[in-house]
């Protein structure tokens, strides 16, 4: 039996990284740092690949420190229609991930591990569960009282100046500029709330400062097959972005090829990956952001398609920063399914929650260990507080408080678990009235499916997409099918004997 039991890593204050003595200047404030940066900008620019590449071996030595000089802004995204029905009752960043976590834990953890401790999360759809999770997982004074760290949700609101809801990524930030500009920082770090990756933002910010950039865009190298699905960028020999193209094809695609050795890739990998795509992750100098959104492009709604291409056109220095690691945009049911199942991959998972040097934090729940009674569990991840009896689980992710009954077979599936346990009294009452308890019933067979929280799957149910349907909407019956993956809705009831 090969079973990985995942425990929730609760957040603990992270000390500021040690800085080399030569880079430590007691008493210098942010204004002094800006004067030093201005002086540097007047010196001849010297290009170094280290300045634009996410190399594990490179050292960071930010002055001023990221905890005092950088504001993290995480964009919660829109209504999440492509992830529906998982977003029916929750915001996209609040969707459960990897048995114990939620999507929002990824960018917040990356921030905390990078010493970015002042964090805002912008959202406007179904934000109740997101607010609850963030308040329980990340308390006040993150990073210690000296740094006055925080993680706060900013919901869309109407005002005399802005009577509309968020119209896009740039508009969301614009509507809260009055709050962001009050922070005495040098840069704004703009992040997405629905990406799965592990990144040291300190290196990203250091590259921004070393290249004297106005804006720095995180870029992912890729081959021709994947490139057609992304917004691509073209750079000059200093790593400066000079052209954008949204999902190009044919000759236009070929024209977007770049020499990725400029950004630090070795020659062999540069031949395999001759394109770079925007990851939707940016560093803006504070004064640049204020000017762009208020003066240059006051009506622009989106960073990727309007603000950043516009900034290059008016002559601003927009740099590319190479991130050569695992990254997944979890924007669709298929991508979400593959990202979750990817953590069970052997011998090396696509994304690991077991990296001690850069932990993923979440809400501490104080649940009991999972109990596995005479079950056959292989190549799977089991969350906390589960009760698994006399069943078979293969290549699956089983979420918090999951209850799986005798004879059940779970294959290539994601079970999100439950928000609470039903008492024995509740179960007895359900049994007497012919009801179905939360969890997976006896002799159920589930294959290539997502079972959302608190679902009640009856006995002898088969969720195996028996007719190989690719797309179907059966909301009144409690499920959808997208890309051939059956998704059972949160709180749904699938009667005993049902075949899907």
UniProtKB/Swiss-Prot annotation:
One of its GO terms (molecular function) is ATP binding. Activated by 3'phosphoglycerate, inhibited by orthophosphate. Allosteric regulation. Pathway: Glycan biosynthesis; starch biosynthesis. It is found in: Plastid, Chloroplast; Plastid, Amyloplast. Residues 1-50 form a transit peptide. The keyword Transit peptide applies. Keywords: Allosteric enzyme, Amyloplast, ATP-binding, Chloroplast, Nucleotide-binding, Nucleotidyltransferase, Plastid, Starch biosynthesis, Transferase, Transit peptide. GO terms for cellular component: amyloplast; chloroplast. Expressed in leaves. Induction: Induced by sucrose, glucose and abscisic acid (ABA). Gene3D superfamilies: Hexapeptide repeat proteins, Spore Coat Polysaccharide Biosynthesis Protein SpsA, Chain A. Heterotetramer composed of two small and two large subunits. This is Glucose-1-phosphate adenylyltransferase small subunit 1, chloroplastic/amyloplastic. It comes from Oryza sativa subsp. japonica (Rice).
